Amino acid sequence: NSEHCRHKIFNASWTLDGQAQPRSLFAMIRNTHAKSPQLTLSAYKDNAAVIEGFPARRFRCDPETGTWGAGAVQPSAFAIKVETHNHPTAIAPFPGAATGAGGEIRDEGATGRGGKPKVGLSGFSVSHLRIPTLPQPWEAARPLNPRMASALQIMLDGPLGAAAFNNEFGRPAVTGYFRSFELETPESGLVRGYDKPIMLAGGVGAIDPEQVEKLPVRPGDAVVVLGGPAMLIGLGGGAASSLASGESSEGLDFASVQRDNPEMQRRCQEVIDACFARGADNPIRSAHDVGAGGLSNAIPELLHDSGVGGVIDLAAIPRDDPSLSPMQLWCNESQERYVLGIAAEHLDAFRAICARERCPHAVVGVATVEEHLLVAECPLDESPIPNPQFRGEAAIDIPMDLLFGKAPKMQRDAERGANARWPRLDTGAMDLREAGLRVLSHPSVASKNYLVTIGDRTVGGLVARDQMVGPWQIPLADCGISLDDFSGYTGQ
């Protein structure tokens, strides 16, 4: 029920200077699409938005023959997504940024009935770097939060984590940004900055137009966890990220950071690729990635979106730690996992695909007509799906309305602050050369070469424009461009 998962503030009613506002923050965001919906196939309802693309010859494996090749020219679409992973990056920059990139990749893969991530981006906003051997005149000494990594440590480790996951998964990062900002306000003396950083992960993926819309999970369909085992990591990450800095305990801060495993995510993606390549016979009816809240969020969302309930067998959930309690098993945020609704008639075909790709998976439950969620150690009958009639001692036994019923709408009141009067800039006392050197040496302006060359920018073979331009290959490109296929000239 965190802000991360339920967006209570973004859906709240707002009063500004005593005047009721006509739209919530989310309604303001959605208003752009409402005014200009053309060419958009899906927006604000799935793990990523989908936009109409150009006809393309997608390079993929034929599900019948098992051979790879470029098929006939077919309509295509592309998925786009940007999200942040700020709190984990503030606590542990490398795994925080790595799992941020990984979570965005999973969102593209879990769009519709399966998409394919193609190219990515990474971005960072931090406070002053305060490099010990390179002090800068604009960096004033002040106390920093000891429970968060310093801006310098974030920029040393975070970009490496994001680049490592992208490359090890098999996706290039072709653009991004880096900003360092910190300023003392003239009247209050408060220092504004990014002690809690922004870690931005985004990307573009490909998806077949006929796979854009999820199909409802039907009673009797299997609920499958695809990917790695559960471990006691990332517990409470979605909740911790929704708290103000310093409100959570130090133990929760470190427990809430996930760990990355790009190889496992690649195996999952190969399974998804093989499923959507089957076209109308795609065994995946609906998909969600496992992120904030772990299975406690992903499985109920999968069922709720289809208007069904479910019986979930705790004993069937893969785990690497046999000591996990039901709460830990249900709520941990172990990465590289997807929750899939698999058509019962295609379950054997799905299992065969997973075996071929050596990708772990488990049937952990079944959808039911009754909109009720039962989570327990359910005895299995002869089928690979838990008995939906089981009503033993349960860890969770609640109606779905209790999770997704309309909660009281939050009311937020705010006032516009007075515009600060900044002192007039005295240019007469400036040394032009010194001013120029300061501007050029500021991290937001200086070369980003060290953030670009840490990763392979050509992996996948569909990059038409990366960060490096010109005869001296300087990272000055103002865009990244990917191609739709290996023979055409269209792309994003």
Name what the model sees in each region.
Residues 1-381, 388-492:
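Glycine/proline-enriched, intrinsically flexible loops and inter-domain linkers
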